[in-house]
Each structure stands twice: as C-alpha cells, then as structure tokens.
C-alpha cells in the first residue's frame, strides 16, 4: 500500500474520506467511507464539487495501483523484444525462454484406439453399476396405519405418539424425548433398516409440537411424527415380526391391562326428565322460580314445615317424589341449564296446545287445573277455608247485578273469539271494583296483564308478552281530556287506537320478545280497564260490551271489616269466580268433560254452605259488616243450597236487608232508599217501595 500513493496523496485521501490515518490499507472500510462521502460531496446533493473531483481522482488512482500491485508477474514481453525467426539470436532467445519450463511437461501426439477398433470381448463386457441412492420413506408402514391418526392439521391433543426416523437419529431422539417430556414409557423398534420410537407422555400435546421439537435434531434425516389412536395395538404390533424391540424404558414392556381404564364409582346423575315433568305439571314458566322450588325438595320430608302446613299444593304434593333427585340437583353445577330446558318444554307444550286444541278445550283444561287445586287446598290435607272463599263469592255477586251471567257471557266471548267482538271494556272511577273483577277473570282463564301506557317505541316488547297466551288484560289505560282534573293523562288510549289490528283479531300480527324470533299469531282476546276517560269512536267500535262500575260504600266497608279477602287475595282468585259459577249456574252450562266434577262440588257446597248462610253473608255485606259474622240459627225447614238463580238470591238478600235494617224513624221506614247502606246503591233495586195512594 505504500507504493500505491505517495505520503501526501494518501494523507489527503484519508482526510477526504473522514477516516483515521491508521485505517490506511483497510480497503472495505475505505470503500464504505468513499460511498458515504460521494453522497455528501456530490454537487446535486449540495456538496463541494472540487472535493468530489479530487476524491474521485485519488480513489481511482489508488484502486488502479492496488490492482497492478496484486497481479502476478508472468514475465511478459513485447513483440519488439523477440528477434527474427531463424536467426542465431532467435535460437538463443528460444533456449533461454524454455529453460523456465518443466521438463516433465510433455504431450503425446499419438491417438488412442477408438471404440470401433476395440476387441469383441470389450464390446460385450458389462460396465460396473453405480450404487443407487436409497429413497427415504414417505410414511409409516401400511400395516400400522390403522393404529395411527391420519390428521395433518389438527389442534387435537394426544398423550401417545410414534416417531419414524433413521437408526442414528432414533438413538439421539430416544434420550431427548425422555428428558424433554418426562415420558411414562418409551421404546425403540427396528423397522426395515430404520427405527420407530413409541412413547407415552403424562400430559397431552399436539402432534405439531412433538414434530417441531424432533425436527430441530433432524436437519437432513427424514422424520415422520404421528399421534396414536390405539396405543396397545400399535405397541403389540411393533413387538412382533417384521418388527422387533431394541430398547424400552420399562423392563418387560407394556401389558394390555395397562390401558384398560379403572372402573369408576357409579355416580348418580340428575334426572332432567323428572324436573321437566314437574315443570309441566305445575305449568311453571319462570326459570328462577322453578330453581327455587326444586331446591326446597332437598330437605327431609318429615321435617319440612311446608309439608306440615300443606298450604302450597305445588310443594307437599311433589316433595316425596322428587326428594332423592333434588339432593343430586343441589350439588349439580348446571342447575340453571336444567331449569331452562324444563321451562322451554313448558312453553313448547303451550305452543302445541294453542295450535292443535280448540279454545273450548283449552278453557276446560284450565278449569280442570283450578279444580285440582281446589281439591288440594280444600281437601283433607289443605288449610284453606271454604267459607272464606264463599264470602268472596257473595261479595263479588253484590258488585254487579247478575254477576254469574256477566262472567258466563265473558267466557262465551273469549272462547268463540269472533273478530271485532273480542274485547270488553270495564270503565269506572277509582275503587269501583273493575280491576278486582278483571284480575279474577284473568286468573280464571289464564293470561297476562299488559301496560299500554308506555311510549310507542317500548310497546313492541310489552306486546310480546302475549305470545301463546289465552287472554290479556290492558290494565288501567290512561287517556287525555278527562272531566276530573285528578286523573293523570297518558298515551294508553292513543296506543290502543294504534293497535286496531291487535284488538280486531282479523289478521295475524307479529309479536316479538328479546332474544327470540318474531312469532306471527292472532292477538289473544281480553278486556280493558280504565277510569273515566273519553274513548274515541274508532276505539269504542272494538269493544263488544262496556260495563260501567260505580263505587259502593257498603262494599268498601264490608271489605275493610273482612281483611282476609285482601290478605289471601280471594277476590282476585280464579277459584272464587269458579265457585260463583258452580253456585249459580246449572250443570249443563259447563263442558261435558268436567260436569261430573261440577256435580261433586255442588253437592259439597250443599252440605257445607246452606242457603241461609249464604244469604246471611250477603246481608252482612249490605250492612258493611264482616261477612263471616254469622249468628247460626236452626231452621225448621230444610234449606236448599245455591242452585237458584242470581236474581232469586239477590232478592232474598234485599228482602232481608229491608226487613231487618229498618230504622226506628217513620220517615226512613216508609222510604228505605234513604238508607246509606241500602242494597240498591249502585244498581237496580229488586224491592221497590210501595206505590203511594192516589191523591
């Protein structure tokens, strides 16, 4: 490098390259610096043109001189140095020129004999064969495929694997796999010059994980890794011809019983079917209610207080049957899923019934359900008092004239479900009894109460509650423009007016619930209750009948003195209305399937509730007293129990009231209508005052 450039030029070049002078001769470093400085000094980049030219000159000169210095000296000569051929100078020059060449360097100019000139023996001789390269196997032997998993791309995890590789790599992998995966068993088997490694791991792994680990140790050698589906059958095949065992981690190898699972202890499972049957029998549609009710069955029957009281038929009737299953259910981790399936079964059965059963059959089934409940709570094990429910019958019968006919006509309306003649309207002021009667009818027939006072955008899911229901009640509908300023305004009447297709029942409508698909069906019939709001004509045309309620002071006082009616919700119970129908209506008005049961209940009412007792109940109601405050008197005549019409019963009550409650004053005795608690308050009087004499 010292002969390439002089000292001044080399120092100048190093300064231009921006390198230390000690780096002179480091050609790669100088090359990088040169390229970097070209970008810096280039005129197009805003650099110094003079420095660029000077650096290029010095660097090119250095490169040229370095190439010349590294070229070997072959003793070249020019044509002017060679003397003329044939002269003595040329002979001497030729001799001196050849002195440097090796004497052994000699080329024979004689040609070898060609293939055609070869002897006959050489033509027919067999040339030596080249050794063929043995191809690596592409898969396990075919007789082992039935024991191996053929999945290529799978996330399935296994605990048994087989590795097919060369004998040399198998010796290495045998130890590496044992250390890496802490195998429970591993063996190496000979297979056609190669080895198969069979091993079991304590934990499950993917085949790809085993393959990736082995592939690191088999760069050039072939490697095939697969999972094993039939562990013992594969191991047994590898120990027989044409395979044989080379080594294994357990002396004596594996036995068949090593792979047979131990017989676990028989664990009792929850009977989903039993829970579903309970939900269907009780018609439970609430998941959490079913969950809570069934968990109560886990306690001992003999110590159960509910069974001792026998006031809940859905408990004491089924406790003993479901006791064993409830104990297992209490320890289950999927209690909600079991109850959800049971509730879905109840809803599915209801949908099938609405599709295949007539409305009369559905109402008959509902009456049977109520009669079953009455048999329980009024039976030997029940704790309900029949007289209290008959007191509710007497109170409801005083609410409206011919109450039994009102209920009968309403049932006739919703059973036949005639389009545009399906809804009733209960209208009246506060505390007039419209909601009490509506709640009783709803419990008698089965259905849901809906709130239409919501904004229209929220009304969609509220109407979805009516899916597969027998009837609905639009409760306490609010409107605008009421005469009384005390009544709040609302959107209920406007919303009902927008739901004419729902009320008419001529076409099917779409009902939807959250997390459920839309259900297309005829909207169920029912009734509407409201205060004294004006009703538009378009909505009034949808009501087949309107009943106007008026508050009655004697009913309110009697209800206040008979608290058991409110505490036990007797007036809102469907059983009370059914008892009212049994008491007043003839047997022929009921469905044929339940007439025998109706006769039994009529006979029981004959024996337990006399006509005098029922008339005394109505008298106490008219006087505002406690309904069951009855002074029993023995009658000489045999009393006939309540098979009479409502008009006769009410007439008797009216006559008793007028006879026993006459005040001492002459003016009140002559005009019973002046009494505050007279029976005619609120409806037509059946005992009219005497006609005054002509003037």
UniProtKB/Swiss-Prot annotation:
Q: Which residues form the SF3 helicase domain?
A: 402-562
Q: Where is the composition biased (Basic and acidic residues)?
A: 666-679
Q: Does the keyword Cytoplasm apply?
A: no
Chain ranges for the short sequence motif Nuclear localization signal as given in the UniProt record? 127-134
Query: Residue positions of the PTM Phosphoserine?
Result: 114, 122, 125
Give the span(s) annotated as Binding to host RB1 protein and transforming activity: 105-109
Entry GO terms, CC: host cell nucleus
Question: Describe its PTM?
Answer: Phosphorylated on both serine and threonine residues. Small t antigen inhibits the dephosphorylation by the AC form of PP2A.
Compartments, record wording: Host nucleus
User: Where are the zinc-finger regions (T-ag D1-type) in this chain?
Assistant: 267-359
* In-chain residues carrying the UniProt-annotated modification N-acetylmethionine: 1
Look up the record and give one Gene Ontology term from the biological process aspect. symbiont-mediated suppression of host innate immune response
Annotated binding of ATP, by residue: 428-435
Q: Is the keyword Nucleotide-binding assigned to this protein?
A: yes
The effect annotated for residue 446 to R is: In strain: MM
* DNA-binding region per Swiss-Prot/TrEMBL record: 141-256
What does the record note about the cofactor? DNA helicase activity requires Mg(2+).
Q: State where Zn(2+) binds.
A: 304, 307, 315, 319
Q: How does it assemble?
A: Forms homohexamers in the presence of ATP. Interacts with host HDAC1. Interacts (via LXCXE domain) with host RB1; the interaction induces the aberrant dissociation of RB1-E2F1 complex thereby disrupting RB1's activity. Interacts (via LXCXE domain) with host pRB-related proteins RBL1 and RBL2. Interacts (via C-terminus) with host TOP1 and POLA1 allowing DNA replication. Interacts with host TP53, inhibiting TP53 binding to DNA. Interacts with host preinitiation complex components TBP, TFIIA and TFIID to regulate transcription initiation.
Q: Kindly provide the name given to this protein in its UniProt entry.
A: Large T antigen
């Amino acid at each position: 490098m010292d002969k390439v450039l002089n000292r001044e030029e080399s120092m100048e070049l190093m300064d231009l390259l921006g390198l230390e002078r000690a780096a002179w001769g480091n050609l790669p470093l100088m090359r990088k610096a040169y390229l970097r400085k070209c970008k810096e000094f280039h005129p197009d980049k805003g650099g110094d043109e003079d420095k660029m030219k000077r650096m290029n000159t010095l660097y090119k000169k250095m490169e040229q001189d370095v190439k010349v210095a590294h070229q070997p000296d072959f003793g070249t000569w020019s044509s002017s140095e060679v003397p003329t051929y044939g002269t003595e100078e040329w002979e001497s020059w030729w001799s001196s020129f050849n002195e440097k060449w090796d004497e052994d360097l000699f080329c024979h100019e004689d040609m070898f004999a060609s293939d055609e000139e070869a002897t006959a023996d050489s033509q027919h001789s067999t040339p030596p064969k080249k050794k063929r390269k043995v191809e690596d196997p592409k898969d396990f032997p075919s007789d082992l495929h039935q024991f191996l998993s053929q999945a290529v791309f799978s996330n399935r995890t296994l605990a048994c694997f087989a590795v097919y590789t060369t004998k040399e790599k198998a010796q290495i992998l045998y130890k590496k796999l044992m250390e890496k995966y802490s195998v429970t068993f591993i063996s190496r088997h000979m297979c056609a010059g190669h080895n198969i490694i069979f091993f079991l791991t304590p934990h499950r792994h993917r085949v790809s994980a085993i393959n990736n680990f082995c592939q690191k140790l088999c760069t050039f050698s072939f490697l095939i890794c697969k999972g094993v589906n039939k562990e013992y059958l594969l191991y047994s095949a590898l120990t027989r011809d044409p395979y044989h065992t080379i080594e294994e981690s357990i002396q004596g190898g594996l036995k068949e019983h090593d792979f047979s699972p131990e017989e676990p202890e028989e664990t009792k499972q929850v009977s989903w079917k039993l829970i579903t049957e309970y939900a269907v029998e009780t018609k439970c549609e609430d998941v959490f209610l079913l969950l809570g009710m069934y968990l109560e069955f886990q306690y001992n029957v003999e110590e159960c207080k509910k069974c001792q009281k026998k006031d809940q038929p859905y408990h004491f009737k089924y406790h003993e049957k479901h006791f064993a299953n409830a104990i297992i259910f209490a320890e289950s981790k999927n209690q909600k899923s079991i109850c959800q399936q049971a509730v879905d079964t109840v809803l599915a059965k209801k949908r099938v019934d609405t599709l295949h059963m007539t409305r009369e059959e559905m109402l008959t089934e509902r009456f049977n359900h109520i009669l079953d409940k009455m048999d329980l709570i009024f039976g030997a094990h029940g704790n309900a008092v029949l007289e209290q429910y008959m007191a509710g019958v007497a109170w409801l019968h005083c609410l409206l004239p011919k109450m039994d006919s009102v209920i009968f006509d309403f049932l006739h309306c919703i059973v036949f479900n005639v389009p545009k003649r399906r809804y009733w309207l209960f209208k009246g002021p506060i505390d007039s009894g419209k909601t009490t009667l509506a709640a009783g009818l709803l419990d008698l027939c089965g259905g849901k109460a809906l709130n239409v006072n919501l904004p229209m955008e929220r009304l969609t899911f509220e109407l979805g509650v009516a899916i597969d229901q027998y009837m609905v009640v639009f409760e306490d509908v609010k409107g605008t423009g009421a005469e009384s300023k005390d009544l709040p305004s609302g959107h209920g009447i406007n919303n009902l007016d927008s739901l004419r297709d729902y009320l008419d029942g001529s076409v099917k409508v779409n009902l939807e619930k959250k997390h459920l698909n839309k259900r297309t069906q005829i909207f169920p019939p029912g009734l509407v209750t409201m205060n004294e709001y004006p009703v538009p004509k378009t909505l009034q045309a949808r009501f087949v009948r309107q009943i106007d309620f008026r508050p009655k002071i004697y009913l309110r006082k009697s209800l206040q003195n008979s608290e058991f009616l409110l505490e036990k919700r007797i007036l809102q119970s469907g059983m009370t209305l059914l008892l009212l129908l049994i008491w007043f209506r003839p047997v022929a008005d009921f469905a044929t399937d339940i007439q025998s049961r109706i006769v039994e209940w009529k006979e029981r009412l004959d024996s337990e509730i006399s006509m005098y007792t029922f008339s005394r109940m109505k008298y106490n109601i008219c006087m505002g007293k406690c309904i069951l405050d009855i002074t029993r008197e023995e009658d000489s005549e045999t009393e006939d129990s309540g098979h009479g019409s409502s008009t006769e019963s009410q007439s008797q009550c009216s006559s008793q009231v007028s006879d026993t409650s006459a005040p001492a004053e002459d003016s009140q005795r002559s005009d019973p209508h002046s009494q505050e608690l007279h029976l005619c308050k609120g409806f037509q009087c059946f005992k009219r005052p005497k006609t005054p004499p002509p003037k």
